[in-house]
């Protein structure tokens, strides 16, 4: 890129000598040339000359183009210094054309320039001087010295001039770079609108991030609050449970304290009253009754038993009955009434054949005297209350005859057997219970002794045989009646045909009544059947007559009404809460609840009834309701409806009540039996003393003419109870008619157990 400016000047000087005449020159001219060269050398020493080497990359460019920037640079650098320099520069510019014509202007190295200069110098000197050898040698020496000086100057000035060129080049490069950078920076910087848009986007992103952060903080706070509330709820629940446990513990402690107080009061009453507890024989013992009694804490050790005359095979388990138990059973009685009641009981117990209260010797242990016919009652599901004798006194059975019967139903569903009367003596009974209650010193005749083991065993065997025979005949009779009803009642509906069938049924029952007329009250020791002990009612059998359809015709149930829809779930709930509750009691509860409901509460169940009726009609379009005949029962060969049977039972109970009230008019003023013992259902599971002679019927002993005293145990409140039961059956009658399990069971007793229980008590 850089060229040497001195070589053209040298060529210029050489070429300036070419116009000399070929005819030669004088010595003066040579001297002028040499002096001029010296002056130029001195000027060149004073002013720095630029020695720019030729560059290879410019071989094809014209010489004027190469040296144009150099001349400009020399003008700028030198400035207005001397006219000689200006003259030299102008001379250089003026001789550019000549130098461009030189054949050596394209040389690219200093050696070529020197060779060219030497050749030209030689040619010029030889041509111009034309002198002898002396002049030639001096001119060559001058040229050589000039060349050497020029070379030295070039070598000397090159390191000084190069930095200035580099500075110029670097300045140019910086300017170009700045120009290019400024353009690129403008492109990168962009317009103000784009910057504002980007700023808006950044602000939007910042706002979004801020809102997201706030949301996260709010959610975190909510979670903290929720966790705190849950912890607070758990703490409150734990505190509530703890309080409930503490309350339950306090209640249990209070119950224990009350129980302890009751025990203390019982002991005080026993000590202060000096009243010996009752002693009631149990005839024969039942393991279930003993277990139930043991749970209540009233059972003595099993070894504590007696044998009347060493011949009674049935030991007596003794259970205490105290005034506290009586007070618990009858909270309405005061202390004075309790004293009177116990006085009456002891008076009934302490009647002796000789008129003495406690004066009989100990040797008469075998003579157990009962003022009434000695009987027992066996309950299948309930423990009879039994009392013990005082430990201080021996078991003086003759001084304290057993007159009170043990019967305490534990549940309203437990059927009761009639009493078995065993009389092995010859003397008839001369006095009754009212007489015994009236005076402790009343005399009664002995009716029998329990010292004949053979007689007792024989009576038991006869009772078992007759009961088994009656059961077999009853089964055969039931089969015949069922066949007759299924054949006849499905086809004949006239009164004449019904009368014929009823007479046939009565004839089938005559044999049973003739063969077992005195065995109605016989106790069944093997099975817990329900046997009526009255003379007029023998083995009442309640059954259902068959429907008015063929045996192969499938039974279509009626659609449930609103009450049945409601009672279905309610009955299930009650059974879950009380699994042992009887169906009749559940029906009473449901009936009373349904009556108490308002029409608004019943509305959804009526809607369900309409839906079920529509669905039933779509499923069975030809369905016709055929009501089954009313329930009937056989009483003494007569077929009676349930209402008639209940009316007969009610009348008989009323008669027995009147009979007992007439005999009790002259007695001591104590509470009636119905008040002392409210009812069989209310007394369920409560051990308490009883009045003598609970059950009685026509005796199955060899003396059928013996008078019988009836008790009014559970008499009060029976008629309202029966009315409520009939009413409940009227309400819920459809429920019982729709259950197939009741239809398929031929032995099911459709009278409620509470009805049978009342009937058994009255008879």
Swiss-Prot record:
Residues 727-752 have a biased composition (Acidic residues). GO terms for biological process: cartilage condensation; cartilage development; cell fate commitment; central nervous system neuron differentiation; chondrocyte differentiation; in utero embryonic development; negative regulation of DNA-templated transcription; oligodendrocyte differentiation. Keywords: Activator, Coiled coil, Differentiation, DNA-binding, Nucleus, Phosphoprotein, Transcription, Transcription regulation. CDD domains: HMG-box_EGL13-like (cd22042). Disruption phenotype: Newborn mice display mild skeletal abnormalities. Mice lacking both Sox5 and Sox6 develop a severe chondrodysplasia characterized by the virtual absence of cartilage: chondrogenic cells are largely arrested at the stage of chondrogenic mesenchymal condensations. Embryos lacking Sox5 (homozygous knockout) and heterozygous for Sox6 live until birth and show severe growth plate chondrocyte defects. Embryos lacking Sox6 (homozygous knockout) and heterozygous for Sox5 live until birth and show severe growth plate chondrocyte defects. Residues 716-726 have a biased composition (Basic and acidic residues). Residues 556-624 bind DNA. Induction: Expression is dependent on SOX9. Pfam families: HMG_box. Residues 193-274, 448-515 form a coiled coil. Residues 1-30, 76-139, 369-426, 708-763 are annotated as: Disordered. The modification Phosphoserine is found at residues 21, 370, 411, 414, 439. The keyword RNA-binding does not apply. The keyword Nucleus applies. Transcription factor involved in chondrocytes differentiation and cartilage formation. Specifically binds the 5'-AACAAT-3' DNA motif present in enhancers and super-enhancers and promotes expression of genes important for chondrogenesis, including cartilage matrix protein-coding genes, such as COL2A1 and AGC1. This is Transcription factor SOX-5. It comes from Mus musculus. The gene is Sox5.
């Amino acid at each position: 890129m850089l060229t040497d400016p001195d070589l053209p000047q040298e060529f210029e000087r050489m070429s300036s000598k070419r116009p000399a005449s070929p005819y030669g020159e004088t010595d003066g001219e040579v001297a002028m040339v040499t002096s001029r060269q010296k002056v130029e050398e001195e000027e060149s020493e004073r002013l720095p000359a630029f020695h720019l080497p030729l560059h290879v990359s410019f071989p094809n460019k014209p010489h004027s183009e190469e040296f144009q920037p150099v001349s400009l640079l020399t003008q700028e650098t030198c400035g207005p210094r001397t006219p000689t320099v200006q003259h030299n520069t102008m001379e250089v510019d003026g001789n550019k054309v000549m130098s461009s014509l030189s054949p050596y202007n394209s040389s690219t190295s200093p050696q070529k320039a020197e060779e060219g200069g030497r050749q030209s110098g030689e040619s010029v000197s030889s041509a111009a001087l034309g002198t002898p050898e002396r002049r030639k040698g001096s001119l060559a020496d001058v040229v050589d010295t000039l060349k050497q000086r020029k070379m030295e100057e070039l070598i000397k000035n090159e390191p000084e001039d190069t930095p200035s060129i580099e500075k110029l080049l670097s300045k140019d490069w910086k300017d170009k770079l700045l120009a290019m950078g400024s353009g690129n920076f403008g492109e990168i910087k962009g317009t103000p609108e784009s910057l504002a848009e980007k700023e808006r986007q950044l602000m939007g992103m910042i706002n979004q991030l801020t809102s997201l952060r706030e949301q996260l903080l709010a959610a975190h706070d909510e979670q903290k609050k929720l966790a705190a509330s849950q912890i607070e709820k758990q703490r409150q629940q734990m505190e509530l449970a703890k309080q409930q446990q503490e309350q339950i513990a306090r209640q249990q402690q209070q119950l224990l304290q009350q129980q302890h107080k009751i025990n203390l009061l019982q002991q005080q009453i026993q000590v202060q009253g000096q009243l010996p507890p009752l002693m009631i024989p149990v005839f024969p013992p039942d393991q279930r009754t003993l277990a139930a009694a043991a749970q209540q804490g009233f059972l003595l050790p099993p070894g504590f038993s007696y044998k009347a005359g060493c011949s009674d095979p049935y030991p007596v388990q003794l259970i205490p009955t105290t005034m506290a138990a009586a007070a618990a059973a009858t909270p309405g009685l005061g202390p004075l009434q309790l004293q009177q009641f116990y006085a009456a009981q002891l008076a009934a117990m302490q009647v002796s054949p000789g008129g003495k209260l406690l004066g009989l010797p100990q040797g008469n242990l075998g003579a157990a005297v009962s003022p009434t016919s000695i009987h027992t009652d066996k309950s299948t599901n309930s423990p009879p209350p039994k009392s013990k004798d005082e430990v201080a006194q021996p078991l003086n059975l003759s001084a304290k005859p057993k007159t009170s019967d043990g019967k305490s139903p534990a549940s309203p569903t437990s059927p009761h057997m009639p009493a078995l009367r065993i009389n092995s003596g010859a003397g008839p009974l001369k006095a009754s219970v009212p007489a015994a209650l009236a005076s402790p010193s009343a005399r009664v005749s002995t009716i029998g002794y329990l010292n004949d083991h053979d007689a007792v065993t024989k009576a038991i065997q006869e009772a078992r045989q007759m009961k088994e025979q009656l059961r077999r005949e009853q089964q055969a009779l039931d089969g015949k009646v069922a066949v007759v009803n299924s054949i006849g009642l499905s086809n004949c509906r006239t009164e004449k045909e019904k009368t014929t069938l009823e007479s046939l049924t009565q004839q089938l029952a005559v044999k049973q009544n003739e063969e077992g007329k005195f065995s109605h009250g016989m106790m069944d020791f093997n099975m817990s059947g329900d046997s009526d002990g009255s003379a007029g009612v023998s083995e009442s059998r309640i059954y259902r007559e068959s429907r008015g359809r063929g045996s192969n015709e499938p039974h279509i149930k009626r659609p449930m009404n609103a009450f049945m829809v409601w009672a279905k779930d309610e009955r299930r709930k009650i059974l879950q809460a009380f699994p042992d509750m009887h169906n009749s009691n559940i029906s009473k509860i449901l009936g009373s609840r349904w009556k108490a409901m308002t029409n608004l509460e019943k509305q959804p169940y009526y809607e369900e009834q309409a839906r079920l009726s529509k669905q039933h009609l779509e499923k069975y379009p030809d369905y016709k309701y055929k009501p089954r005949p009313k329930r009937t029962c056989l009483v003494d060969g007569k077929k009676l409806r349930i209402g008639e049977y209940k009316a007969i039972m009610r009348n008989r109970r009323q008669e027995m009540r009147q009979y007992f009230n007439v005999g009790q008019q002259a007695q001591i003023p104590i509470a009636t039996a119905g008040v002392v013992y409210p009812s069989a259902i209310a007394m369920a599971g409560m051990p308490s003393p009883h009045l003598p002679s609970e059950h009685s019927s026509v005796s199955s002993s060899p003396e059928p003419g013996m008078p019988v005293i009836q008790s009014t145990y559970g008499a009060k409140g029976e008629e309202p109870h029966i009315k409520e039961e009939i009413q409940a059956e009227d309400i819920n009658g459809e429920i019982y008619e729709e259950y197939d399990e009741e239809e398929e069971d031929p032995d099911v007793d459709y009278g409620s157990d509470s009805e049978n229980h009342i009937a058994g008590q009255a008879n």
